[in-house]
Amino acid sequence: VSLSKSKSNTNAHSSLVTDHAESEVSLSAVEKDANHMLIQASIQDSATSDEVDFVHDAVLLPETVAAVLGVKSLPTQAEGNDQNCLNMSGIYVDATFGRGGHSRLLLSQLADDAKLIVFDKDPTAISVAQELASKDSRVHVVHDSFATLTTSLAALGITQVDGLMADLGISSPQIDDGSRGFSFMRDGAVDMRMDTSRGQSVAEWLEYVDEETLANVLYEFGEERHSRRIARAIKQMESYDSTLALAEVIKVAHPNWQRGKHPATQSFQAMRIFINNELGDVDDFLAQSIPLLKVGGQLAVISFHSLEDRRIKQFLQRHSKGQYPEDENLPMPPKRPRYFSKPKRVGPSKTETSRNPRARSAWLRMATRTDSDYVIDDAP
């Protein structure tokens, strides 16, 4: 049963390893971390004290900014050196502002006439973004999902951009704040909405959803093999007002625990993804990147789990090869445009994962927009 809420439409450094339609970039820990401390210090100078923890944890930070700017690497950072800026003009989008780690580093490489449009669903993230915008006229803030990319940019008079970047998934502050409902380690209301100002919470949804639909959600969005057993236990709960109580019920119902992984991990992921329509939004975002990016424009997307990463990989393969799976059995397959160059992939170094364990599952995929004209019928 497909439960997606919206229609799902299915450069870097050296040492490339070919993987189907992508090139995987392998970077040494020494190369990736040579400038890390100075980069982080520079960003933290522009962040308020309560944002520093998140800024420090921004994943694949210089790699993502270099990718969205279309350069191999950022200039060497040096204290007191003002010549470490690329001074690039253009219009760029940070589709997932968070606490602004990637945005701040990107701004440090942009010219005075450049523009940076930042999106986020989270009201707290938007407050941080608005504070940044009040200090930097290049920043424009959109409080909405990146699925609204085209219409939101059009409202600002923008039809095409030079670069798009997104850091998918949940942020550290959201996990660490028990009141948001994302954590099974801290108690709070069973909410899980990225945007607490709109939509229904997971608790409200659990009150009326039937057991079969819940099981399908756990299986489809959490890849939970024991979804039916867990769904049955959840529906037997008297109330849904505590994340710790919900996690305990899942823990008791789960027959097999993977060592080092909480048994509620996949179920919490599934409910969060479903209630926020995360995969549908990713599909919509990727589809809109084709007409929005200028020729030579850069797409850079970080994902943290296989459901997201698989979508990004398949999208870039499809539109870099010009080969659609549905065309394979046709006697005369149509000639499809190749909208992107051969994709590349970057993972975190061992140094980064030791410093920030949440980076372990991260993958950055990137590609360059070709000069193929956009054809509406070829939309994903």
Where would I find each of the regions flagged by the language model?
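S-adenosyl-L-methionine-dependent methyltransferase catalytic core, i.e., the SAM/SAH-binding region
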Residues: V1-P380
